[in-house]
Swiss-Prot record:
It comes from the Eukaryota. One of the primary rRNA binding proteins, it binds directly to 16S rRNA where it nucleates assembly of the body of the 30S subunit. Belongs to the universal ribosomal protein uS4 family. The keyword Ribonucleoprotein applies. This is Small ribosomal subunit protein uS4c. Pfam families: Ribosomal_S4 (PF00163), S4 (PF01479). The gene is rps4. SMART domains: Ribosomal_S4, S4. Part of the 30S ribosomal subunit. Contacts protein S5. The interaction surface between S4 and S5 is involved in control of translational fidelity.
Amino acid sequence: MSRYRGPRLRIIRRLQNLPGLTNKLVESKKNKVSGSDQSIQKKVSQYGIRLEAKQRLRFNYGLTERQLLNYVRIARGAKGSTGQILLQLLEMRLDNILFRLGFVPTIPSARQLINHRHILVNNRIVDVPSFHCKPKDIITIGAPKTYQSILSKRLESFAKDQIPEHLTLSLSEPKKPKGFVNYLINRESIGLKINELLVVEYYSRKA
């Protein structure tokens, strides 16, 4: 299954707000159901609940079905909680790190910068959005000056308290912002509200 490229609002109306996909907030279809319609709503099956959790995870991080399945398999083979390791793997992707640092408004925007070879990790160009960032990595922007000025203005208005503790944003040089990875993210700092166990259960027979 390929990566979704359709209307984003349609997705978040169905799956609720996904910060990585879009910064627009909309009321979900579930909240718009009138009192008379609630009585005739079909009960969602356990499979449906797990499927929705999986879809929320996939669309928020911009993954294909195959990519997400591969991450689940990696998480299953590691020591510790499969669900938490899965979230950690997704959060430590380079495209998500750029998003959490405030360099870009969404993960798709981050992926575009990376694909255009504008991102450096430890002074080396990285053009793979799925690149796994590690503690002590330093992330900088090598984009044209026009984007540098846009970025500096964006970061001026970006609230630093939105940056999770495992990351640090340095603006000592306003036109050359730097992002630092302090340590692997913990569960409390995950950017998406989700029950990861539902995703693990969904893939229990596939991974």
